[in-house]
């Protein structure tokens, strides 16, 4: 279709207004100026279109041509996504570097998926088979870890006329389907508009936890596969390290990491670390299951708004194959700031703190695309997409609009605390403020799959930490010596729980990841010390004798015990029981 060319009448930073655009539609992608800068129509008034331009607009002036492509902002979905690094509108950064150097040249046009790379396609269906949207046509081994399942594109159903094994690029024809509307060609790639969620049969209630290997998360505030979580915290409290830890060790088959408006160095860290680290499940490099979207703080603001949608659309595509996906967005605050900037330039009525009135609905749109679903297709496979967003409230103020709008939507809140971070307690997740609404689902799963007293131990530990907070308040007023020995013991056990269990070193080879069976044994050992010590106190043993037991050091060092030697934690528990019994028999006054 030959569309009329419009003309620029106003340029205001990333916002460009063009007239003569009556043939264009809302959310169409347009090319602006002689350099053909990429932009998207975000508002239409008569023949005038307001366009957010995803590139630097300096040098652009009134009278410059604007051409609409007639299509919405879409991503290319096919082999070549894994291990790739894209910007916010899915331009491949490695291909841009090869073509134009270290910085993205304005107006550069590079296909998202390589048109040269050849993939070997193995069909799982044959000519004559009846297929519908979502059915798996065949497989491409994308990396040594990920098998890319080629699906029937949305909106197509019918009978396969031909489907051939062989080596293809993403745009080569691999077969044909006869539909009601005629014959459709099949390729390894499909396109999908980023602002529209991909279809599925139905949503399921999430129940299995997404194991992260982070003790404070898995034990106290678990997130399910297909769940939503947010990590708000002030600057320097460790949001990015928490996100990196989850991306490294989460029990997901594919990780989509969106660096949205954060520092470039943080994406560099990911690029440097992930290829070196081994996935505990496959033994392969973590990069072989990761898609990176880098939209750093020095890239155009408008592209931040798109980067979140680009990332979640890629996540949904892999979810449709039947995979479990973990999506990290770091940080949604920068995305909200981009919304605020565009809203201000559009002269819309501002809401709270200048954010647009539709901030809450946009956030909800994003998080609602997560979930545990039955995918389209005749085999009824399950897929899960877990969304975890970091929020950076200015000054750590959790009452600001982005945090509040996020908390209304997500079910897990990991509140990072600057006081804990200053005390070098990492991950700095505050156990008194944080919560998980998935506990009633995850608890029975843990009792069944890990240990039958998991929920009971968790409740005891939480009660102890709550009691510690109350006792510390009293100790600050009247001094620790005024507390009874039993209360001082509670403070010591809670301290052990905090320092020996909740604290975790992200940069230690062993402590960076703790499997569930190790977490259970460690928690049990700490709480067992509390129970046994209380018995000893009641039998007349002095508190200092209990606290000086050498076995306490072994409990503290249990976090550094390798997964292979996990049974040695049980030995520590036996030694603890024996030492306390010896203390009672030597120095205690046993009840008659």
Curated annotation (Swiss-Prot):
Where ATP is bound, by residue?
Answer: 233-240
What catalytic activity is recorded? ATP + H2O + 4 H(+)(in) = ADP + phosphate + 5 H(+)(out)
Q: Which UniProt keywords apply?
A: ATP synthesis, ATP-binding, Hydrogen ion transport, Ion transport, Nucleotide-binding, Translocase, Transport
Q: According to its UniProt entry, what is the function of this protein?
A: Produces ATP from ADP in the presence of a proton gradient across the membrane. The V-type alpha chain is a catalytic subunit.
Q: What is this protein called?
A: V-type ATP synthase alpha chain 1
Q: Which family does it belong to?
A: Belongs to the ATPase alpha/beta chains family.
* GO BP, one annotated term: proton motive force-driven plasma membrane ATP synthesis
- SS bond partners: none
An example Gene Ontology cellular component term from the record?
Answer: proton-transporting ATP synthase complex
Top EC group: translocase
Q: Which organism is it from?
A: Clostridium tetani (strain Massachusetts / E88)
Q: EC annotation?
A: 7.1.2.2
User: What HAMAP family has UniProt attached to this entry?
Assistant: ATP_synth_A_arch
| GO MF terms held by the record | ATP binding; proton-transporting ATP synthase activity, rotational mechanism; proton-transporting ATPase activity, rotational mechanism
């Amino acid at each position: 279709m030959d569309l009329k060319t419009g003309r620029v009448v106003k340029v205001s930073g990333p916002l460009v207004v063009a007239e003569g655009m009556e043939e264009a539609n809302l959310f169409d992608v347009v090319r602006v100026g002689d350099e053909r800068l990429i932009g998207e129509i975000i508002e239409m008034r008569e023949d005038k279109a307001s366009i957010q331009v995803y590139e630097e607009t300096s040098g652009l002036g009134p009278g410059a041509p604007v051409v609409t492509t007639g299509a919405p902002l879409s991503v290319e979905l096919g082999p070549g996504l894994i291990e790739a690094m894209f910007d916010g509108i899915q331009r491949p950064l490695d291909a841009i570097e090869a073509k134009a150097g270290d910085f993205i040249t304005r107006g550069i046009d590079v296909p998202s998926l390589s048109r040269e790379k050849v993939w070997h396609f193995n069909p799982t269906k044959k000519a004559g088979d009846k297929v519908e949207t979502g059915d798996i046509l065949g497989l491409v081994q994308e990396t040594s870890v990920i098998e890319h399942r080629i699906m029937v594109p949305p909106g197509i159903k019918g009978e396969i006329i031909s489907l051939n094994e062989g080596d293809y690029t993403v745009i080569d024809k691999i077969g044909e389907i006869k539909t009601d509307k005629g014959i459709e060609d099949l390729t390894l790639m499909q396109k999908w508009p980023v602002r529209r969620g991909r279809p599925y049969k139905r949503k399921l209630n999430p129940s299995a936890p997404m194991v992260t290997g982070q003790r404070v998360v898995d034990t106290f505030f678990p997130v399910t596969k297909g769940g939503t979580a947010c990590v708000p915290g002030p600057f320097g409290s460790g949001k990015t390290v928490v996100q990196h830890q989850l991306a490294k060790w989460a029990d997901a088959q594919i990780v989509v990491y969106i660096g949205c408006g954060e520092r470039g160095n943080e994406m560099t860290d990911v690029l440097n670390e992930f290829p070196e680290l081994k996935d505990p499940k496959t033994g392969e490099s973590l990069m072989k299951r990761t898609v990176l979207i880098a939209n750093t703080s020095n890239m155009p603001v408008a592209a931040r708004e798109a980067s979140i949608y680009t990332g979640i659309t890629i996540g949904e595509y892999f979810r449709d194959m039947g995979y479990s996906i973990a999506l990290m967005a770091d940080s949604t605050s920068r995305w909200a700031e981009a919304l605020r900037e565009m809203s201000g330039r559009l002269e819309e009525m501002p809401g709270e703190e200048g954010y647009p009135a539709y901030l809450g609905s946009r956030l909800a749109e994003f998080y609602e695309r997560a979930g545990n679903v039955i995918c389209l297709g005749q085999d009824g496979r399950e897929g899960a997409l877990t969304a975890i967003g970091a929020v950076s409230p200015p000054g750590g103020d959790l009452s600001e609009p982005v945090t509040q709008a996020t908390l209304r939507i997500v079910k897990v809140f990991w509140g990072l605390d600057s006081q804990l971070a200053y005390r070098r307690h990492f991950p700095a997740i505050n156990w008194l403020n944080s919560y998980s609404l998935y506990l009633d689902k995850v608890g029975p799963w843990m009792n069944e799959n890990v240990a039958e007293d998991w929920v009971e131990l968790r409740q005891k530990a939480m009660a102890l930490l709550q009691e510690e907070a109350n006792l510390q308040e009293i100790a600050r007023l009247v001094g620790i010596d005024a507390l009874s020995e039993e209360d001082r013991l509670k403070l010591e056990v809670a301290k052990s729980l905090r320092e020996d269990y909740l604290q975790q070193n992200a940069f230690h080879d062993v402590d960076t990841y703790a499997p569930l069976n190790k977490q259970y044994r460690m928690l049990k050992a700490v709480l067992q010390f509390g129970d046994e010590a209380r018995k000893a106190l009641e039998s007349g043993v002095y508190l200092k004798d209990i606290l000086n037991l050498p076995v306490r050091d072994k409990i503290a060092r249990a976090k550094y015990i390798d997964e292979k030697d996990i049974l040695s934690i049980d030995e520590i528990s036996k030694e603890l029981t024996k030492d306390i019994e010896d203390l009672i028999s030597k120095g205690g006054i046993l009840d008659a």
